[in-house]
């Protein structure tokens, strides 16, 4: 992506501004990581603070100064972000970025808790944390991830605590921007604060320009195939209606989704 065609952020470019970028985690190459990458394009010299950093994200950030937490040293098997809620709360809650004029956090979980004692903190909120506020039932039911039973039990017990922590963390940023009108409503409802505006996520629109119209039938869905995206509902609906559905993407739910797909469902 290039800056002129994909970056819509109305952020300062004052010379010599000391900037830090903060992300919940960098473990894939999805929309969340691409927002961080867009910020990196604007501020290429800004360090990126995050909890864990996996190989799947390294292509995007090969030239970035990524600074991870102590959680990066944990064995890969237990470095799943679902299991590290409390450690991340402690890490970001105690991370004081004193040497920066501007701190920009972006995410849906704990990054917003970072402190910027001597500067300003802008948060780009993807959504109030889904598993605490928006779709807790999706996270508490059995899924395909073998670690889910441990995580589900812990989340049920800790839900009141993590909700209180998340609410307080959401009050820390000086400015909080939503990525959509729906997220704007959620911030008002769950965090009791008025968002300062909407910042649309970057989109690589050059890929779609001058492609021409193509006659197709049915529906298309794409994204990471993880439980909370509920792609199973799209497949179930198209199975029952007998209409075509093209499912694009991959993830831990891929095998389960293929198993439930009827003759009108295709995967790519």
Which residues make up each language-model segment?
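Active-site proximal beta-strand in glycosyltransferases
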Residues: 102-104, 115-148
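A short beta-strand/loop micro-motif in the catalytic core of glycosyltransferases
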Residues: 104, 172-180, 246
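Active-site donor-binding segments of glycosyltransferases and PAPS-dependent sulfotransferases
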Residues: 42-112
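Membrane-proximal helix-turn-helix segments that form the acceptor-binding/catalytic region
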Residues: 143-176
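Nucleotide-activated donor-binding/catalytic signature segment of Leloir-type glycosyltransferases, i.e.
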Residues: 255-268
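Short donor-sugar binding/catalytic loops of nucleotide-sugar-dependent glycosyltransferases
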Residues: 25-26, 222-226, 251
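Conserved donor-binding/catalytic core segment of Leloir-type glycosyltransferases
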Residues: 201, 208-246
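Helix-loop-beta element that forms the nucleotide-linked donor phosphate-binding surface
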Residues: 177-178, 183-203
């Amino acid at each position: 992506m290039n800056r002129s065609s994909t970056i819509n952020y109305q952020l300062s470019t004052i010379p010599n501004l000391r900037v830090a970028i903060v992300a919940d985690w960098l473990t894939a190459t999805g929309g969340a990581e691409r927002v961080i990458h867009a910020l990196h394009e604007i501020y290429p010299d800004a360090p990126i603070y995050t909890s864990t950093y996996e190989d799947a994200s390294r292509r995007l950030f090969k030239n970035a100064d990524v600074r991870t937490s102590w959680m990066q040293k944990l064995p890969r098997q237990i470095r799943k972000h679902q299991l590290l809620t409390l450690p991340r709360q402690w890490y970001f809650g105690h991370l004081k970025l004193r040497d920066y004029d501007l701190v920009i956090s972006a995410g849906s979980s704990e990054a917003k808790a970072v402190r910027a004692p001597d500067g300003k903190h802008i948060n780009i909120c993807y959504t109030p944390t889904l598993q605490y506020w928006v779709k807790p039932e999706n996270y508490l039911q059995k899924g395909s991830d073998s670690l889910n039973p441990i995580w589900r039990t812990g989340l049920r017990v800790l839900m009141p605590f993590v909700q209180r922590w998340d609410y307080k963390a959401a009050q820390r940023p000086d400015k909080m921007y939503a990525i959509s009108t729906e997220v704007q409503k959620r911030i008002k409802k769950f965090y009791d604060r008025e968002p300062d505006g909407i910042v649309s996520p970057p989109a690589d629109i050059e890929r779609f320009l001058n492609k021409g119209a193509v006659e197709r039938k049915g529906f298309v869905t794409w994204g990471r195939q993880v439980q909370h995206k509920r792609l199973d509902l799209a497949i179930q609906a198209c199975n029952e209606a007998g209409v075509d559905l093209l499912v694009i993407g991959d993830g831990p739910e891929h095998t389960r989704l293929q198993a439930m797909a009827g003759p009108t469902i295709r995967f790519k």
